UniProtKB/Swiss-Prot annotation:
This is Ubiquinone/menaquinone biosynthesis C-methyltransferase UbiE. Keywords: Menaquinone biosynthesis, Methyltransferase, S-adenosyl-L-methionine, Transferase, Ubiquinone biosynthesis. The keyword Cell inner membrane does not apply. It comes from Francisella tularensis subsp. tularensis (strain WY96-3418). The keyword Methyltransferase applies. Belongs to the class I-like SAM-binding methyltransferase superfamily. MenG/UbiE family. PROSITE patterns: SAM_MT_UBIE, UBIE_1, UBIE_2. GO terms for biological process: aerobic respiration; menaquinone biosynthetic process; methylation. The gene is ubiE. The lineage of its organism: Bacteria, Pseudomonadati, Pseudomonadota, Gammaproteobacteria, Thiotrichales. S-adenosyl-L-methionine binds at residues 73, 94, 122-123, 139.
């Protein structure tokens, strides 16, 4: 079946393959200005701990080239700028221009200049040379990608041999009681918060649905192997609400 006739998930809705990217873009154009505030409210600030653990496992050193993919408002990119120093380079990349503008303004105001570039790009066809980056991170972005397999293969292509990919993403809770509570919170509280803070309940309804449609821990692990990564492992956080997958290129 050609992509023109294929459908894919947009939350719980099936949409034509080529329309998902436009719909996801609409979501993030809508929420970009309040994205950081909503992250703090939705996760009770815990997203900062998840990201801190991701940075700690990145293995980034001075002089490295780092790609923060789907980097949005730049939480990870800011830390990486400090870690690589002026000898290194960080590229903050996002497919969404609104998110990228918020990230650029935020990091510039924090004094992050000289060793960072901002690139609007699609994860499925990254505009970077082969074997270029020492480390790639994608934080809460992979589930929004239409062709995840193609995106993972693209990441593997631009990663240097010896480099690592870190995928921080919502996943499947491993504790049954937590799963029930999490479902109630996701489908009721998140759209309510979205309506109050951003006047956009539908975007946060999509967020809850997109999490449920994202591959579970073991499935994503195998997808990373299939894309060319080795020694893939994952760490559950907060009972599996979030998982950090790490894969290496040799």
């Amino acid at each position: 079946m050609s992509k023109e006739n294929k459908t894919t998930d947009f939350g719980f809705t099936q949409v034509p393959w080529e329309e998902k990217q436009k719909k996801v873009a609409g979501v993030f154009h809508s929420v970009a200005a309040k994205y950081d505030l909503m992250n703090d409210l939705m996760s009770f600030g815990i997203h900062r701990i998840w990201k801190k653990q991701t940075i700690a496992k990145s293995g980034v050193h001075k002089g490295d080239n780092v790609l923060d993919l789907a980097g949005g408002t730049g939480d990870l990119a800011y830390k990486f700028c400090q870690m690589v120093g002026q000898q290194g380079k960080v590229i903050l990349s996002d497919i969404n221009s609104s998110m990228l503008e918020v990230g650029k303004e935020k990091l510039t105001n924090k004094g992050c200049v000289g060793n960072i570039e901002y690139v609007q790009a699609n994860a499925e066809c990254l505009p970077f040379p082969d074997n270029y980056f020492d480390c790639i991170t994608i934080s809460f972005g992979l589930r929004n990608v239409t062709d995840k397999d193609k995106a993972l293969a693209s990441m593997c292509r631009v990663l240097k041999p010896g480099g690592r990919l870190l995928v921080l993403e919502f996943s499947k809770p491993i504790i049954p009681l937590l799963s029930k509570v999490y479902d109630e919170y996701s489908f009721k509280a998140l759209p309510f918060l979205g309506k109050i803070i951003t006047q956009d309940a539908e975007s946060y309804k999509y967020l809850a649905e997109s999490i449920r449609k994202h591959p579970d821990q073991q499935t994503l692990k195998q997808m990373m192997y299939d894309a060319g990564f080795d020694n893939v492992e994952y760490q559950n956080m907060t009972g599996g609400i979030v998982a950090l997958h790490i894969g290496y290129k040799y």
